[in-house]
Every structure is written in C-alpha cells, then in structure tokens.
Amino acid sequence: MSKQVRVRFAPSPTGPLHIGGVRTALFNYLFAKKHNGVFYLRIEDTDQTRFVPGAEAYIMEALEWLGISPEETVGKNEKFGPYRQSDRKDLYQKYADQLINSGWAYYAFDTPEALDAHRKQHEAEGKTFIYNHHNREKLDTSLVISAEETAKRIANGEHYVIRFKTPVDETLHLKDIIRGDVKFETNLLDDKVLFKSDGMPTYHLANIVDDHLMETSHVIRGEEWLPSMPLHVLLYRAFGWDAPEFAHLPLILKPVGNGKLSKRDGDKLGFPVFPLEWKTEEGVSSGYREKGFFPEAVVNFLALLGWNDGTDKELFSLEELVEAFDLNRVHKAGAKFDPEKNKWFNHQYLIKQNDADLAKSFSTILEEKGFSTPLEVTTRIVSLIKERAHFVSEFWDLTDFFFQAPSSYDEKASKNWKEETPALMKELISVLENIEDFTSANIETIVKEWLTKNEIGMGKVMQPFRLSLVGALKGPHLFDIVEIIGKEETVSRIQKAISAL
C-alpha cells in the first residue's frame, strides 16, 4: 500500500465490550499486522451521559487478554494524543467553526419542545419529519436570522447546536472494500448535529477530525455504521481532506431467530457475549475468560465469523490469521453465532495444551474440593480425559472417581451385576492382591490371562469391575484407573460394591 496502514478500534466506554466489538477490534488488528501497519485504540467518550465507570479499563484488559493489544492508546505511545476524546474536546470547536465559516454548517436554536411540535405536525399530515433542506430555512437557524442576531443569541448563553448542511440533489457513489459500490441520495439524509453548546462534539464530528489528525488510512467498522458513511465522506469533502478507505463488517446474528446478537442474548441463552465477566448492581454477565475459554480459541472462532481464507481450514494461530487475512474475503451477509461451534474451538485448543499446564489449572479446582494430589498424578489423569472435555472446569465431573469412591451406582449399569458377580469379584480381588508390578499394562495382562484360563467372559467381569470403581460405565481405560487409585483402594471399592449391590 502506498501510505502506512493505520487503523483504529474506537469504542465508547458505555459498558462491557460486546463480542461484535471484539471482532471489529480483531479484524482491525489483523489488517494492521498483515500490512505492517499500526493498530491503535481511541476512546470515544463524547457522550458523557452514557459514560460507565470501569468500562474503559475493561476494554483495555479485554484486548490484552485476547492478545490483540493496540500499539498506541491512552497512556501508551500517544503519537497523536490524547487518545481519549474527552481530553481532546478543546480542539473540536475550531473545526466546527471552520465548517460554519465555509458554509458547510449552521447554528440551530430549536428547543426540544419546538422540534417535538414539528414532528407531531408532520405525523398528523402523514409525513416524516427530517431536519434537512426541506425545512432548515423554516426553522430557528442561522440560515434565516442575521449574523448579528446569531452572535447575540450565542453571547447570551442560549442553547444551540451546530448542524451539517447536507448538499441538495446529489447522488453519492461511494466505495466500500467489502460491499463494493454503494449509492446514497443526499436528499434523503438529515442535517446531523455536529457540535453542542456544552462544548462537546457529537460522534460524527469528533470521529472524522480524529481519524484525520491520527492519520487513519482505513476505517473498518460494523455494518450498523454504513448509513453514516455518506455524512462522513461529505465531512471529509467539507474540510478538504482525503477520506480513508471504508470497510463495513457484517453483523453477528443470533443463533436462533432473526436479528443482531445483543448483549442480553448471552444471559438469556446461556453463553457468554463478553470477553470478560461484567458485574453491575443488577447482576453478573458471564465472560469468556471466567467460563474457561482460551483466548486463542475465542480469537480463532471470531475470525471465522464472516471471514474465511478460501479453504476448509478452521484452526488458525494468531500468526496464521495475520498471514491469511484479507478484507476482500469478508462476507457481506451476517454470520450466525453458533455457541456449540464456539465450544468446539475451545476443545480443539484444550487438547493441544500441555498436560502439566492443564493439571496446574485443574489442581486449583481439586484444592477447592479438599484434595491435595501430586502434580504428576494429576497430569496423568488429565492426559486420560482431556479429549472428552471442552473446558478445564469439566475435568472434575470426568475424574471424580479418581479421588473418591463412588457413593452410589448407576441404576441402569447395575443391571450388569448378576447373581454370580459377587463370587467373580472375590476371585478378582485375589488376583489383584497377588500382583506385585501394579502398572496398567501388567494388571491388564494378568487379569485377562485369569479370564482366559477360567473361560470367564470379559463382560461378566469388566463391567462390574468398572461399576465398582467408578459407579457407572464411564471413564478412561479401566486398568489406567486401577493403577492410579492403587491396589488397596481398588480392592476396597470392589468389596464395597459387593456389599452394596
């Protein structure tokens, strides 16, 4: 590319970062890295009424956990700082004034009550009220009152806004990297508010000014911002600046039904839609981190929501995603969020983890349950069951019988306990007690030799044997269980089963 790629993620700190925002950040990160560019984070907090304490720190922590931290942001490499819009508010006034002076904007003094009256009047006539060329010169604006009167009203502290003066009778033919050619009629656009009398710009003005001053080369954002594209392109024209290239990402859709995946869907349907847990007075919304997802799995899953590399490949490291990523392969249509596929990705990353690392995580769970087990034993157990798990948190239900004897026996499996079973189990105890090399392979060899020699069917012993140790017909290789729990515990559990069943 001819100029340096500089892309940004620019969230508003109005609450926890939704998974759709995370994907936007990820695609910006991948694009920047692919083109040896810069990915930066700008905090867009111009609407102070919606500001939520803790949200900014949450956004930064989430990106760090996911491994996609920005190179420039608040307090870090602020080359074009400040990177928080509320800290930049003094500079926006001059750009608003510039638009006034060049005829691209005007002052509007309409009160909320007056605007409401206009809306109601239009509704009564079966029309929709749009603040634009149709009525801007019939309203209380600097387009119809003198410059002296305008200055006097501002000096007297009267509330006003500065609105963009949208051109009339123009068809805008714009280019979007993902959607191709898009067309907008300026007569259908409203004159958006750019600046308020409290000295704060709206999103539209601050966004364009900052993208220009921070040398943003590409704006990669969600599809919900596509209707704002004509205004933003016109603002670049009004300032005489080159516009960046635009790419509008497809929506992430609900797993069932229609519409965009919302912040409420996760709690309602039982899966996380936030990278990290978010606590409020109303309750706790679950996060991927706290649910036991690996950040690499979340990144891999999100990358494939609306993009693929043109092959059937599904598992990508972050480095492989950077190498393969291409905005031209991002889909236009929305991508359905599949919670089961989400878990599948986590399973794929779990089974690739080092057994000892997983054992350390599992040891924390064991300690909470009152079990202190040598790490090498826990590591061996993990190696036997991790293929069956999506999360480390599932390990306990897959392994509880390694740590404690069953307190009950599966009713259906207990039907395998026949009249002759107790006698066979007592014989098995004798066989086990005489084994000196109590290792899985050796135990298996000796037990099977005993079965063959005495012409005893495998099912007559193996199923009751497993039921005695586990309490159900589940679990990894039976003789691995026997070795790990040891001879004494194995014999004790068989004796207990004989008494109970």
From Swiss-Prot:
Compartment(s) where it occurs, according to its Swiss-Prot or TrEMBL record: Cytoplasm
Residue interval(s) of motif 'KMSKS' region: 260-264
Protein residues bound to ATP: K263
Biological process annotations from GO: glutamyl-tRNA aminoacylation
Primary localisation category: cytoplasm
UniProt key word Methyltransferase: no
Tagged with keyword Magnesium: no
InterPro entries in UniProt: aa-tRNA-synth_I_cd-bd, aa-tRNA-synth_I_codon-bd_sub2, aa-tRNA-synth_I_CS, aa_tRNA-synth_I_cd-bd_sf, Glu-tRNA-ligase_bac/mito, Glu/Gln-tRNA-synth, Glu/Gln-tRNA-synth_Ib_cat-dom, GluQ/Sye
E.C. no: 6.1.1.17
Catalytic activity: tRNA(Glu) + L-glutamate + ATP = L-glutamyl-tRNA(Glu) + AMP + diphosphate
Motif ('HIGH' region): 11-21
Class of the enzyme per the UniProt entry, highest EC level: ligase
UniProt GO MF annotations: ATP binding; glutamate-tRNA ligase activity; tRNA binding; zinc ion binding
Keywords: Aminoacyl-tRNA synthetase, ATP-binding, Cytoplasm, Ligase, Nucleotide-binding, Protein biosynthesis
PROSITE patterns, per database record: AA_TRNA_LIGASE_I
Role, per record: Catalyzes the attachment of glutamate to tRNA(Glu) in a two-step reaction: glutamate is first activated by ATP to form Glu-AMP and then transferred to the acceptor end of tRNA(Glu).
Subunit structure: Monomer.
Family of this protein: Belongs to the class-I aminoacyl-tRNA synthetase family. Glutamate--tRNA ligase type 1 subfamily.
Name recorded for this polypeptide: Glutamate--tRNA ligase
